[in-house]
């Protein structure tokens, strides 16, 4: 009889360990930091970025530490970063649900439309904690005029790192650092592209 209880306890412990190892911990990439916005140097244009509800609801799962995984919503979390990057360059920024409505774009005075594609990845060098210690976020934007003709493309990447001792309950720290760098680089790439002035 003790053998049966011992076997049952061992099986339960193995099942629990397997279940915990396979879970995905939620984190967020939203950053409070934005590039500086100097009204005297803003391009006097109204621009838009495209973000659909389906994109905002898209959940992604990537690697964390100790065999665990992390889950987050890249479009929802990075929407503020994209908007902040555009607001650092242009006078007026709006959001569209679709890029294809040329008449509405022209009527609204939109001169450029940014359609972003986001890719992310994470990893961890830690075997004792689950938060990612390395995070990469990349945004690639196709930029069109109000009628839908492609003007140019811009790309930006942000890499973030965080060590175990830095987390202090802030488990998405590496992701937020990546988002902050992505925002600054996207703003810089837009500003130096002559086709986007």
What are these regions (language model features)?
Residues 24-32, 98-151, 161-162:
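Surface-exposed short loop/turn segments
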Residues 18, 42, 108:
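Structured loop/turn residues at beta-strand edges in well-structured enzyme cores
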Residues 76-102:
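Mid-chain, structured segments of secreted extracytoplasmic proteins
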